[in-house]
Amino acid sequence: IPLSVFHFDCFWMHEFHWCDFEWDKKCFPDIRATLKKYHDKGLHICAWINPYIAQGTAFFKEGAANGYLLQRADGKGVWQTDNWQAGMGLVDFTNPDAVKWYTDKLRTVLDCGVDCFKTDFGERIPVDVVYHDGSDPQAMHNYYTYLYNQAVFSLLKEVKGENEAVLFARSATAGSQKFPVHWGGDCSANYPSMAETLRGGLSFAMSGFSFWSHDISGLESTATPDLYK
Protein backbone atom coordinates (compact mmCIF):
# COMPACT_ATOMS: atom_id res chain seq x y z
CA ILE A 1 0.00 0.00 0.00
CA PRO A 2 1.52 3.37 -0.99
CA LEU A 3 2.35 5.49 2.04
CA SER A 4 3.35 9.16 2.15
CA VAL A 5 2.34 10.30 5.65
CA PHE A 6 2.83 8.61 9.02
CA HIS A 7 0.42 9.87 11.67
CA PHE A 8 0.86 9.88 15.45
CA ASP A 9 -2.52 10.03 17.20
CA CYS A 10 -3.13 11.17 20.78
CA PHE A 11 -0.76 8.83 22.60
CA TRP A 12 2.35 10.60 21.33
CA MET A 13 1.67 12.58 24.50
CA HIS A 14 1.39 11.05 27.96
CA GLU A 15 -2.14 9.82 28.69
CA PHE A 16 -4.43 12.52 30.12
CA HIS A 17 -1.92 15.20 29.13
CA TRP A 18 -4.01 16.20 26.12
CA CYS A 19 -2.78 18.59 25.15
CA ASP A 20 0.51 19.76 26.61
CA PHE A 21 2.39 18.97 23.38
CA GLU A 22 5.15 17.08 25.18
CA TRP A 23 6.30 13.76 23.72
CA ASP A 24 5.91 10.80 26.06
CA LYS A 25 9.53 10.07 26.92
CA LYS A 26 8.74 6.46 27.85
CA CYS A 27 7.60 5.71 24.31
CA PHE A 28 9.77 8.21 22.45
CA PRO A 29 13.06 8.73 24.32
CA ASP A 30 14.71 10.30 21.25
CA ILE A 31 11.93 11.65 19.09
CA ARG A 32 14.20 13.59 16.75
CA ALA A 33 16.08 10.41 15.82
CA THR A 34 12.80 8.52 15.44
CA LEU A 35 11.28 11.08 13.10
CA LYS A 36 14.50 11.32 11.10
CA LYS A 37 14.18 7.61 10.30
CA TYR A 38 10.70 8.24 8.88
CA HIS A 39 11.90 11.25 6.91
CA ASP A 40 14.79 9.22 5.51
CA LYS A 41 12.19 6.84 4.09
CA GLY A 42 10.50 9.74 2.31
CA LEU A 43 7.58 10.04 4.75
CA HIS A 44 5.95 13.15 6.13
CA ILE A 45 4.92 13.24 9.80
CA CYS A 46 1.52 14.27 11.17
CA ALA A 47 0.73 14.71 14.88
CA TRP A 48 -2.68 14.83 16.57
CA ILE A 49 -3.64 17.94 18.55
CA ASN A 50 -6.70 19.71 19.90
CA PRO A 51 -7.46 23.06 21.62
CA TYR A 52 -8.23 21.49 25.02
CA ILE A 53 -5.65 21.70 27.80
CA ALA A 54 -5.44 19.06 30.55
CA GLN A 55 -5.72 20.48 34.07
CA GLY A 56 -2.93 18.25 35.43
CA THR A 57 -0.23 19.80 33.24
CA ALA A 58 2.18 22.68 33.63
CA PHE A 59 0.79 24.02 30.35
CA PHE A 60 -2.67 24.37 31.93
CA LYS A 61 -1.28 26.18 34.95
CA GLU A 62 0.58 28.59 32.69
CA GLY A 63 -2.50 29.24 30.57
CA ALA A 64 -4.75 29.74 33.59
CA ALA A 65 -2.31 32.12 35.27
CA ASN A 66 -2.04 34.31 32.17
CA GLY A 67 -5.71 34.37 31.17
CA TYR A 68 -5.18 32.31 28.02
CA LEU A 69 -8.13 29.96 28.65
CA LEU A 70 -11.87 30.61 28.36
CA GLN A 71 -13.29 32.04 31.58
CA ARG A 72 -16.44 31.18 33.52
CA ALA A 73 -19.36 33.55 33.13
CA ASP A 74 -19.65 33.88 36.92
CA GLY A 75 -16.11 35.24 37.17
CA LYS A 76 -14.80 32.25 39.13
CA GLY A 77 -11.80 31.45 36.96
CA VAL A 78 -11.20 29.05 34.09
CA TRP A 79 -14.18 27.29 32.53
CA GLN A 80 -13.57 23.54 32.72
CA THR A 81 -15.32 20.41 31.48
CA ASP A 82 -14.92 16.64 31.61
CA ASN A 83 -16.07 15.99 28.02
CA TRP A 84 -12.73 14.68 26.80
CA GLN A 85 -10.75 14.36 30.00
CA ALA A 86 -11.18 15.55 33.57
CA GLY A 87 -11.19 19.32 34.09
CA MET A 88 -9.82 20.42 30.74
CA GLY A 89 -9.76 24.09 29.73
CA LEU A 90 -10.11 25.62 26.25
CA VAL A 91 -7.70 28.04 24.61
CA ASP A 92 -9.17 31.52 24.07
CA PHE A 93 -8.25 32.21 20.45
CA THR A 94 -9.68 35.75 20.66
CA ASN A 95 -6.67 36.63 22.82
CA PRO A 96 -3.62 37.35 20.61
CA ASP A 97 -1.28 36.48 23.47
CA ALA A 98 -3.03 33.12 23.90
CA VAL A 99 -2.66 32.39 20.19
CA LYS A 100 1.06 33.11 20.38
CA TRP A 101 1.40 30.97 23.53
CA TYR A 102 -0.40 28.06 21.88
CA THR A 103 1.39 28.25 18.54
CA ASP A 104 4.80 28.77 20.14
CA LYS A 105 4.27 25.42 21.86
CA LEU A 106 3.28 23.84 18.55
CA ARG A 107 6.40 25.33 17.01
CA THR A 108 8.51 23.15 19.34
CA VAL A 109 6.68 20.09 17.97
CA LEU A 110 7.47 21.15 14.41
CA ASP A 111 11.09 21.65 15.43
CA CYS A 112 11.24 17.95 16.36
CA GLY A 113 10.44 16.99 12.77
CA VAL A 114 6.64 17.04 12.55
CA ASP A 115 5.31 18.34 9.22
CA CYS A 116 1.58 18.87 9.80
CA PHE A 117 -1.15 18.56 12.41
CA LYS A 118 -4.43 16.72 12.75
CA THR A 119 -6.54 19.43 14.38
CA ASP A 120 -9.11 17.34 16.18
CA PHE A 121 -12.21 18.62 17.97
CA GLY A 122 -13.10 22.33 18.06
CA GLU A 123 -16.84 21.71 17.93
CA ARG A 124 -17.65 21.12 21.62
CA ILE A 125 -17.61 24.79 22.50
CA PRO A 126 -19.52 26.16 25.53
CA VAL A 127 -21.83 29.16 25.44
CA ASP A 128 -21.66 29.99 29.17
CA VAL A 129 -18.17 31.52 28.98
CA VAL A 130 -16.41 34.86 28.67
CA TYR A 131 -14.04 35.60 25.79
CA HIS A 132 -11.02 37.91 26.01
CA ASP A 133 -12.36 40.23 23.30
CA GLY A 134 -15.93 40.22 24.62
CA SER A 135 -17.32 38.10 21.78
CA ASP A 136 -20.85 36.74 22.07
CA PRO A 137 -20.45 33.09 23.17
CA GLN A 138 -23.45 32.03 21.06
CA ALA A 139 -21.88 33.51 17.94
CA MET A 140 -18.50 32.04 18.85
CA HIS A 141 -19.84 28.47 19.04
CA ASN A 142 -19.30 27.95 15.31
CA TYR A 143 -16.60 30.57 14.79
CA TYR A 144 -14.26 29.07 17.40
CA THR A 145 -13.12 26.33 15.04
CA TYR A 146 -12.26 28.94 12.40
CA LEU A 147 -9.92 30.77 14.79
CA TYR A 148 -8.45 27.48 16.04
CA ASN A 149 -7.59 26.14 12.59
CA GLN A 150 -6.53 29.57 11.36
CA ALA A 151 -3.96 29.81 14.16
CA VAL A 152 -2.49 26.38 13.41
CA PHE A 153 -2.57 26.79 9.63
CA SER A 154 -0.89 30.22 9.85
CA LEU A 155 1.93 28.68 11.86
CA LEU A 156 2.37 25.91 9.30
CA LYS A 157 2.47 28.44 6.46
CA GLU A 158 5.14 30.38 8.32
CA VAL A 159 7.29 27.35 9.11
CA LYS A 160 6.65 25.03 6.14
CA GLY A 161 5.74 27.50 3.43
CA GLU A 162 2.61 28.31 1.42
CA ASN A 163 2.70 25.15 -0.68
CA GLU A 164 3.46 22.73 2.16
CA ALA A 165 1.05 23.89 4.88
CA VAL A 166 -1.74 21.37 5.46
CA LEU A 167 -4.06 20.30 8.26
CA PHE A 168 -6.31 17.30 8.82
CA ALA A 169 -9.15 19.14 10.52
CA ARG A 170 -12.31 17.76 12.10
CA SER A 171 -14.61 20.76 12.61
CA ALA A 172 -15.42 23.56 10.20
CA THR A 173 -17.59 26.58 9.53
CA ALA A 174 -18.04 29.10 6.73
CA GLY A 175 -14.60 30.04 5.42
CA SER A 176 -12.79 27.01 6.82
CA GLN A 177 -11.96 25.87 3.29
CA LYS A 178 -9.00 28.27 3.55
CA PHE A 179 -7.40 25.79 5.95
CA PRO A 180 -7.45 22.41 4.17
CA VAL A 181 -7.94 19.47 4.55
CA HIS A 182 -11.02 18.37 6.54
CA TRP A 183 -12.29 14.91 7.31
CA GLY A 184 -15.69 13.65 8.34
CA GLY A 185 -15.04 12.85 11.97
CA ASP A 186 -15.81 9.59 13.72
CA CYS A 187 -18.19 7.73 11.43
CA SER A 188 -19.49 4.27 12.27
CA ALA A 189 -18.71 1.10 10.32
CA ASN A 190 -22.16 0.53 8.82
CA TYR A 191 -24.05 1.33 5.64
CA PRO A 192 -26.15 4.22 7.04
CA SER A 193 -22.99 5.94 8.26
CA MET A 194 -21.33 5.40 4.88
CA ALA A 195 -24.29 7.11 3.22
CA GLU A 196 -24.09 9.97 5.73
CA THR A 197 -20.38 10.36 5.00
CA LEU A 198 -20.99 10.57 1.25
CA ARG A 199 -23.75 13.14 1.76
CA GLY A 200 -21.42 15.13 3.99
CA GLY A 201 -18.71 15.10 1.34
CA LEU A 202 -21.14 16.28 -1.33
CA SER A 203 -22.34 19.04 0.98
CA PHE A 204 -18.73 20.07 1.54
CA ALA A 205 -18.12 20.24 -2.21
CA MET A 206 -21.23 22.39 -2.70
CA SER A 207 -20.02 24.71 0.09
CA GLY A 208 -16.70 25.60 -1.52
CA PHE A 209 -14.42 22.97 0.02
CA SER A 210 -12.00 21.53 -2.53
CA PHE A 211 -10.69 18.70 -0.34
CA TRP A 212 -12.26 16.32 2.16
CA SER A 213 -11.64 12.88 3.55
CA HIS A 214 -13.13 10.33 5.96
CA ASP A 215 -12.23 7.36 8.13
CA ILE A 216 -11.51 4.35 5.91
CA SER A 217 -14.26 1.76 6.59
CA GLY A 218 -15.45 3.79 9.59
CA LEU A 219 -14.00 4.40 13.03
CA GLU A 220 -16.58 3.04 15.47
CA SER A 221 -16.65 -0.80 15.46
CA THR A 222 -15.25 -3.04 12.70
CA ALA A 223 -16.61 -3.08 9.18
CA THR A 224 -18.00 -6.30 7.77
CA PRO A 225 -16.09 -7.66 4.73
CA ASP A 226 -18.79 -6.55 2.30
CA LEU A 227 -18.87 -3.01 3.71
CA TYR A 228 -15.07 -2.74 3.76
CA LYS A 229 -14.89 -3.69 0.07
For each feature predicted by the language model, list its residue ranges.
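Catalytic-domain carbohydrate-binding cleft regions of carbohydrate-active enzymes
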Residues: 1-229
